[in-house]
Amino acid sequence: MCIRDRDKYKQFIRRREIRVELQNAVDHNFKNFDVYYQPIIDIHTRNLIGAEALMRFTSEKFGMISPAEFIPILEETGLIIPAGRWMMKEAMGKCSEIRKILSGFRMSINISQVQASKSDVIQDISAEMKRTGLPLEAVIVELTESDLLEQNINEKHFLTELKRMGISLALDDFGTGYSNFHYLSELKPEIIKIDRSFTAKAVADEQEYYLLNQFCTMIHNLDMKICIEGIESAQEWLKIRKLCPEFTQGYFWGKPCGYEEFVRKFVQEK
């Protein structure tokens, strides 16, 4: 067996073992799953205004697995539907707790294409709203740009129902796909999240910065808000803030962390 084939075989075995662990975790009350929270900052006040809920999984054999590795497995197997429902329940419950301290706090929850097209995610959101008593403005649903470009009939129904309910939509990873402003005007998301890859290029190159500036101007002209993702240093922040986004997030403000650490670092101190 050549080295390339051997590496592919190792990857196949690893993927298969992770898939088995994921199934076992879902079957046993989502054992080894966790939800991390990354702060979202208001650009004008530099205060915490919300968080993005992020799914995490720790393998008993391999340790913490990157979401880029385990999320696709969840989607391929359909396990993203129960796992996503579990994460939504956790995140909305924690949002309710934080709002007792910070009344305007909002929770952003990622919904995958599989969830939007194959599950009763709208009913799940509605049920959790009733259970937690959260107002509509407390929850933001995040969909990626690539998922929206591939939307099918069921996803269109999902977006229609989302609007009907009055739940805010955020378009995540903007700049990584086709970035068609026509569909932006149709969907009218409240927030456009500029991807880290776009941000990094803009900081390093003046032409890229000019392009991002034009994007931001067009987004604002469509009456949408902007969240710049991936700010990792004060230098980046000083340059990016000139684009006048409403919100920002990134390691400069705080890395994703567990709920107790998040509350200790970002909520109780406020």
Language-model features: locations:
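EAL-family c-di-GMP phosphodiesterase catalytic domain
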Residues: 10-11, 60, 112-119, 138-152, ...
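Charged helix-capping and loop-helix junction motifs
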Residues: 20, 123-126, 154-158, 206-213
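Catalytic core of bacterial c-di-GMP phosphodiesterases, primarily the EAL and HD-GYP domains
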Residues: 45-49, 79-155, 230
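Structural preference for long, well-ordered alpha-helical segments in enzyme cores
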Residues: 69, 73-74, 87-95, 124-125, ...
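Surface-exposed amphipathic alpha-helices with a cationic face
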Residues: 95-99, 129-130, 156-164, 213-220, ...
